[in-house]
Every structure is written in C-alpha cells, then in structure tokens.
C-alpha cells in the first residue's frame, strides 16, 4: 500500500486529461493505495476577476489577496472547481470527499507576515489574506483513507479564528506530502515533465537528483518558474516524501506507469 498526493493545476480540472487521471486513480484506490488530491484554480480565478472588473495583482508570481480576491477564491476554488472535480471523479468510479481549510480544519494555517520576496525588491511584502500551512487534520484524512475515500482539498486554509486564507496549491500539496510521509507527490501540469528544450516534448528528462538539478540550473537548461517549483519539490523530499513526479500531456495509463515504473512518464525527482 502506497500513500500518494496528487496536485492538479486549475487548467487540468476542466480538461479531457482529468478523465485519464481519474481512471488511473480508480485502479490505485482499488489496490488499497491511499490517495489525496490537492487542486488550485488560478486561471479560473483570474478569469472571474476580469469578468467582475477586479484587478489581478501578482507579486513575484504570487497572488495578492484582498477581501474581494478571497471571495473569488472561495467561489472558484472551494466552490465550483471542487464540485466539478469531485463530480468527474465520481463519474469515473472514484469516491471523492471535497474539503477545504474550514472542513474539520483540514488545512490549518496562519496569516503570512510581510516578508522579503525574491524578485520583489528589498522591502518586506504583505500579500494580504495569504496563509502559511501549519498543519493538517491527519486523523480526518486517515479515516477517509481507511474507508477508501479520496480527499479532494481546495487550496484554502483556515486559522483558529475561522478566517479563510489563500494558499498556493503547490505549497499545500508539498506540505501534505511531507506530513503524510507520502511515497510520491505527483504534480500534474501542462508540460510532460522537465524538458531539456521547452519547445521539444521529446527532450523529457526521466530522472533528476538534487545534484543534477543544480547542474541543470547552472547551465541554463532549467530556468524561470521551473526553478522554484523544483526547489520546493526537493524540500518535500527532505521533509519525508520519497519521490516527486512532474507529469503532464497525459496519455492513458501515464499516471499509473509513472508510479509503478518511475521515469517511464514525466520526470521523477529523487534525493540522490
């Protein structure tokens, strides 16, 4: 039996790829594996903000969250996307349970204090109603796993006073994988893994160690937004997870293959 945390980007939730993920998930759950899903909703939140005439303010790649933005995130992430995702999973034979931070305090958080952020200048930045994960309701998740349910967590945390807080989905998934000491954290993205040439899907790198990652950054093969994503992924390995898989542009069976035969699909990150 393995413990798997699956992170789905908002762009995946309404794509045909989700059905491929769901079918592989059913096979994994039928094999008594414990699976938890974390999802974001950035693209959908930005689209709704535009429709409502609200400004989307990004600071060093992070969404500034005021009261109006938090209301959008509640509607989009904890509402529509969570319901739609659970519905698609249910249609494919998976038994999901939709959760967010206020659901049994599933995602416990505190408001992030102002801090200096790379790419945002020397002064501390206040991101507003943004949270840092401080824990999870692991007994609740354990009970769901025992009954072969799949927890589906929207990336909204909640503090002890009941205040909802926006949290980056990759961060929630990474922290959850560490807390569960997961066998694998799988990041399902819009790319088929880490590529030597971003324009050539066939240049996928099957396996990367920490030392190899540092070499690939130094020679420019890995750059831009992929650097912090992989940095955080390697921190997950230090925190107790056994492997991280970056996967996308899925074909039937890719998720199951990536877990059963690491490196056969996507890119697997390992500590050494």
Swiss-Prot record:
<feature type="binding site">
    <location>
        <position position="63"/>
    </location>
    <ligand>
        <name>substrate</name>
    </ligand>
</feature>
<dbReference type="InterPro" id="IPR036393">
    <property type="entry name" value="AceGlu_kinase-like_sf"/>
</dbReference>
<keyword id="KW-0028">Amino-acid biosynthesis</keyword>
<keyword id="KW-0547">Nucleotide-binding</keyword>
<dbReference type="InterPro" id="IPR004662">
    <property type="entry name" value="AcgluKinase_fam"/>
</dbReference>
<feature type="site" description="Transition state stabilizer">
    <location>
        <position position="229"/>
    </location>
</feature>
<dbReference type="InterPro" id="IPR001048">
    <property type="entry name" value="Asp/Glu/Uridylate_kinase"/>
</dbReference>
<comment type="function">
    <text>Catalyzes the ATP-dependent phosphorylation of N-acetyl-L-glutamate.</text>
</comment>
<keyword id="KW-0418">Kinase</keyword>
<feature type="binding site">
    <location>
        <begin position="41"/>
        <end position="42"/>
    </location>
    <ligand>
        <name>substrate</name>
    </ligand>
</feature>
<keyword id="KW-0055">Arginine biosynthesis</keyword>
<dbReference type="GO" id="GO:0003991">
    <property type="term" value="F:acetylglutamate kinase activity"/>
</dbReference>
<feature type="binding site">
    <location>
        <position position="166"/>
    </location>
    <ligand>
        <name>substrate</name>
    </ligand>
</feature>
<comment type="similarity">
    <text>Belongs to the acetylglutamate kinase family. ArgB subfamily.</text>
</comment>
<dbReference type="Pfam" id="PF00696">
    <property type="entry name" value="AA_kinase"/>
</dbReference>
<keyword id="KW-0808">Transferase</keyword>
<dbReference type="InterPro" id="IPR037528">
    <property type="entry name" value="ArgB"/>
</dbReference>
<feature type="site" description="Transition state stabilizer">
    <location>
        <position position="7"/>
    </location>
</feature>
<protein>
    <recommendedName>
        <fullName>Acetylglutamate kinase</fullName>
        <ecNumber>2.7.2.8</ecNumber>
    </recommendedName>
</protein>
<keyword id="KW-0067">ATP-binding</keyword>
<dbReference type="GO" id="GO:0042450">
    <property type="term" value="P:arginine biosynthetic process via ornithine"/>
</dbReference>
<dbReference type="GO" id="GO:0006526">
    <property type="term" value="P:L-arginine biosynthetic process"/>
</dbReference>
<keyword id="KW-0963">Cytoplasm</keyword>
<comment type="pathway">
    <text>Amino-acid biosynthesis; L-arginine biosynthesis; N(2)-acetyl-L-ornithine from L-glutamate: step 2/4.</text>
</comment>
<dbReference type="GO" id="GO:0005737">
    <property type="term" value="C:cytoplasm"/>
</dbReference>
<dbReference type="GO" id="GO:0005524">
    <property type="term" value="F:ATP binding"/>
</dbReference>
